[in-house]
Structure formats: structure tokens, C-alpha cells
UniProtKB/Swiss-Prot annotation:
One of its GO terms (cellular component) is cytosol. Belongs to the class-II aminoacyl-tRNA synthetase family. Binds 3 Mg(2+) ions per subunit. One of its GO terms (biological process) is lysyl-tRNA aminoacylation. Coiled coil: none annotated. It is an enzyme of class 6 (ligase). Its EC number is 6.1.1.6. Keywords: Aminoacyl-tRNA synthetase, ATP-binding, Cytoplasm, Ligase, Magnesium, Metal-binding, Nucleotide-binding, Protein biosynthesis. Its cofactor is Mg(2+). SUPFAM superfamilies: Class II aaRS and biotin synthetases, Nucleic acid-binding proteins. Mg(2+) 2 binds at E422. The keyword Lyase does not apply. This is Lysine--tRNA ligase.
Length: 505
């Protein structure tokens, strides 16, 4: 049985599993033979070149030029194709062919090559050459096995197309799917660019606790754990906000953190319990400054990753090069729902009825501001396709944000929506310690009334504010959702290397 025999679309799942088990047994026999000959997994080879880089570096060299230059190279990679005389190797940079010179290679090497399988990792030395078809290859003068692969790669007919298996076996997904490798290279580029962008503007990168005694900084349900040595309940953080603002109090006037947050909530194409968030804070700035900074960041990211400010996503194109729309929560409800009037939004009973009809989970004790946000979430969010800054969130749902000077019923806050998804949340920070204490008390009352996502009272944070925090603007940006946009990925699981899954039966 060979990999080619397994590569038959007519096989049923049971037949395919049976044949795969036979292949694994054969490969284990081959590994046993290699063990008898000496070191089965050598680690003394050092390459001097990468496959993809060689392709780029010598793209313009002709067959005759390469033959005259006789450029020696050492490469290593995984066998992805085996055509007998030629094998295709893949490393982190790309693919390159190697030529099995039956006249130039020792007889024992040629015999060993016959036992190699797709997925095996080999080391090759030789000179660069170009085929009659124009393909670059390495004319091998020596080659040896570095790692024996015991499991066959997915065949070319079926591949690794089952979405759940791609998430569960990301290592295989990365081997066989260039699109997946590209997605995570882009993710790395995005994070590196954000760091550079903020560093250039004087921000200091910091790290704050993942384990917290009081989960704060967001309206979310936390994961709970127990610290054995201290014999106390602790929580995985839902946000780093309150610690970052403590640092602003301490004199670090521009700080940021890129790290994980944890929220014990639902799993969907937009939500993962463990996710990556950028949060940054700058003193002597307000939420409007953050809107300007965010537009600049998103334009630079699109240009750096895509080479354009037009971002394709599904059947849409988002325009990062144009000014982002700025609209209040209140005005956005009226704009996108012409059947709702200002009188409806300003009446608690009418607003409650609209929220219930829209499908919101109304408990009955909500104030007018919270009801307006519920209506917005149900009837507006999904309609915000192009980038929208939604501003002036009611203070009831913004316990950490500064009230607006002209209208104290709302806060100096915005959320950024693109493609109907929240990408960022920001506000001018509340730095009035007494107001903050009152809002924490109101949140505790909400929690006592049954709101699992309401905040705890954080006395130490109030104490920090009592020392005085300068006027400050802060923002959180979801890295995963941002990468989804920039890689045209439909699910958040597509941009997280190892997303959470239920255990297999």
C-alpha cells in the first residue's frame, strides 16, 4: 500500500481509515529499519538557504547562467511531491524541487530514497540548476533523512477540507494549506506593525496581571479559579483596563498592552473565550484624538498588509482610505430604523417594548439609556458595513467612561464597527474618583438584580483615582477580528491557531 493507493476518491471513510492504518504500520516498519542503521533522528545538519528565498533570489538567472555559476546550497524540508526523478520540498518560506541524480548519488542513498514517503523531512546539498521548463531545482550531490513521518498527509483529492479537523489538527492544516500559513503570517505582521506604530508615538509596552482578585474593565462574565497557596478565589482577566489606568496615575502617560483576555461566554464565528486584545491609554487626550489615531492605524495596517486601503471581505470592500463615519447611538437608531421616532426613544415604556420586540433580553429594571443600547445592538449593529465610529453611549452602559460636558446622560465614548462587527471600544476616561465610586455601586446593584456581566466594586482602583489621574483617553481593539478583516476570514477560529473545541468523542 502506498500514499498513491490511498489517494483514491472512490474509497469510503471506513476503507480510507483502514488503508491509512496500514500505511502507518508500513512507515513504522521503515522507521524501525532506520533505527537499526544508527541515529534515526539526526540533528547535525545546518542549512544555509531557504526554498522560497532561493526562488526569489535566482528568479532572473537562466539555465546557462546557473550552470556556469555552480552555486552550492544546503536546504531542508518536507517532501510534498515525489515524481521519481524530482521531489518537491517545502520549508517555512516556500517550495523547491530537488533532482535525484541516479548517476551522481551513491547506491545506498538511492536505495534509501526508495523507502521515503510524502511528509518525510530530508536534508539536501547540491548546486542550483534550471529545468528545460524553466523550474529552479537543486541538483543533489547528497541527501539524507532527518525525520520519518509516521502518518500520511491528507490526499490531494480530499485534502484537509473538514473545517473542524482543520481547527483540531492545525499542524496538518499548516502543512497542506498555504492559505492558512498566509493568514497567520499576516497576523504576525499586524501585531508587529501595531507595536511599531505605537512605539514610534511614544507609547510604552507593559504587562499587567492575568490572574486578578477582582475582574474589571469590561462588562463580561469571568472564568473563576482558586489560588491554593493563598486560599482565595481569583479570576482570569476580562480586560487589563483598570491596571493600565493605575499606570497612568503612576506617571506612565502613554501605555499599551497586547495580550489575552478571557470571557466565560458563548462561542461563535465572532467570539472565542480566549482572545487577543490591544489596549492603549494616552494622557492629555480625549476620545476624538483616539478616533483620529485609530483611522491612521487602520489605514497604515491595510497598506502594510494588503498594499491598498480597500479591504476586500466576502462580497464587500471596506474603504479604510475614506474618513470613517461618525454617528451617535441615538442618531444611528433613527437613521437605520425610520419607523422608530425620537418620542419612542425618549420614553422608557416604548423603548422597552421596542427592545423586547427586537429580541433583546430585557429583565425589566433597565433604564432608558441601557434600553437604547439594546435597541442599537439588535437593530443597527449588523447594518454598519463601512467603518463607523458610533459615539455618545449612555452612561448606564459606560461605567468607566467620562460623562459628556454638554449632555451628562451620555459619555465621551465610541465603538468602531466594520462589517457589522465591533472592532474597537474607546472613551475619554472617567478620572473623577467620587463619580467612579458611585458608578461601581450602581454596577453592584445591577449584579444583585441578576446581571452576570455587571462590574464588581474595585476599591483599590478608586483609591488610585483619588491620587489623581490626568485627563486620559483609552481604547481596546480586538486583534482577532481585525485580522479576520485583513485576511478575509469568515470565522474567528480561522485566525486563532488553536481555537477552543469540544473534546472529540
Amino acid at each position: 500500500m502506498s500514499d498513491q493507493q490511498l489517494d483514491q476518491p472512490s474509497l469510503s471513510h471506513e476503507e480510507r481509515q483502514h488503508e491509512e492504518n496500514k500505511l502507518i504500520a508500513q512507515r513504522k516498519e521503515k522507521l524501525a529499519a532506520v533505527r537499526e542503521q544508527g541515529i534515526a533522528f539526526p540533528n547535525d545538519f545546518r542549512r544555509d538557504s531557504l526554498c522560497g528565498e532561493l526562488q526569489k533570489q535566482y528568479e532572473g538567472k537562466s539555465k546557462e547562467e546557473l550552470e556556469a555559476a555552480a552555486i552550492p546550497v544546503k536546504i531542508a524540508g518536507r517532501i510534498m511531491l515525489n515524481r521519481g526523478a524530482f521531489m518537491v520540498l517545502q520549508d517555512t518560506s516556500g517550495r523547491l524541487q530537488v533532482y535525484v541524480d541516479r548517476k551522481g548519488l551513491p547506491a545506498e542513498t538511492l536505495e534509501a530514497i526508495k523507502t521515503w514517503d510524502l511528509g518525510d523531512i530530508i536534508a539536501a546539498e547540491g548546486t542550483l540548476a534550471r529545468s528545460g521548463k524553466g523550474d529552479l531545482y537543486v541538483n543533489m550531490t547528497s541527501v539524507r533523512l532527518l525525520t520519518k513521518s509516521l502518518r500520511p498527509l491528507p490526499d490531494k483529492h480530499h485534502g484537509l477540507t473538514d473545517t473542524e479537523q482543520r481547527y483540531r489538527q492545525r499542524y496538518v492544516d499548516l502543512i497542506v494549506n498555504e492559505e492558512t500559513r498566509h493568514t497567520f503570517r499576516v497576523r504576525s505582521q499586524v501585531i508587529a506593525h501595531i507595536r511599531r506604530f505605537l512605539n514610534e508615538r511614544g507609547f510604552l509596552e507593559v504587562e499587567t496581571p492575568m490572574l486578578q482578585t477582582i475582574p474589571g474593565g469590561a462588562a463580561a462574565k469571568p472564568f473563576e479559579t482558586h489560588h491554593n497557596a493563598l486560599d482565595m478565589q481569583m479570576f482570569l482577566r476580562i480586560a487589563p483596563e483598570l491596571y493600565l489606568k493605575r499606570l497612568v496615575v503612576g506617571g506612565f502617560e502613554k501605555v499599551f498592552e497586547i495580550n489575552r483576555n478571557f470571557r466565560n461566554e458563548g462561542v461563535s464565528t465572532r467570539h472565542n473565550p480566549e482572545f487577543t486584545m490591544l489596549e492603549f491609554y494616552q494622557a492629555y487626550a480625549d476620545y476624538r484624538d483616539n478616533m483620529d489615531l485609530t483611522e491612521e492605524l487602520f489605514r497604515e495596517l491595510a497598506l502594510a498588509v494588503l498594499g491598498t486601503t480597500d479591504v476586500p471581505y466576502g462580497d464587500k470592500v471596506f474603504h479604510f482610505g475614506e474618513p470613517f463615519v461618525r454617528l451617535s447611538v441615538y442618531d444611528s437608531i433613527l437613521k437605520y430604523n425610520p419607523d422608530i421616532t425620537e418620542a419612542d426613544l425618549n420614553d422608557v415604556d416604548k423603548a422597552r417594548a421596542i427592545a423586547k420586540k427586537a429580541g433583546a433580553k430585557v429583565l425589566g429594571h433597565e433604564g432608558l439609556g441601557k434600553l437604547q443600547v439594546m435597541i442599537f445592538e439588535e437593530l443597527v449593529e449588523s447594518k454598519l458595513e463601512q467603518p463607523h465610529f458610533i459615539t455618545e453611549y449612555p452612561f448606564e452602559v459606560s461605567p468607566l467612561a467620562r460623562r459628556n460636558d454638554q449632555n451628562p446622560a451620555v459619555t465621551d465614548r465610541f465603538e468602531l464597527f466594520i462589517g457589522g462587527r465591533e472592532i474597537a471600544n474607546a472613551y475619554s476616561e472617567l478620572n473623577d474618583a467620587e463619580d467612579q465610586a458611585e458608578r461601581f455601586h450602581a454596577q453592584v446593584a445591577e449584579k444583585d438584580a441578576g446581571d452576570d456581566e455587571a462590574m464588581h466594586f474595585d476599591a483599590d482602583f478608586v483609591r488610585a483615582l483619588e491620587y489623581g489621574m490626568p485627563p486620559t483617553a483609552g481604547e481596546g481593539i480586538g486583534i482577532d477580528r481585525l485580522v479576520m478583516l485583513l485576511t478575509n476570514s469568515p470565522s474567528i477560529r480561522d485566525v486563532i491557531l488553536f481555537p477552543h473545541m469540544r473534546p472529540q468523542a
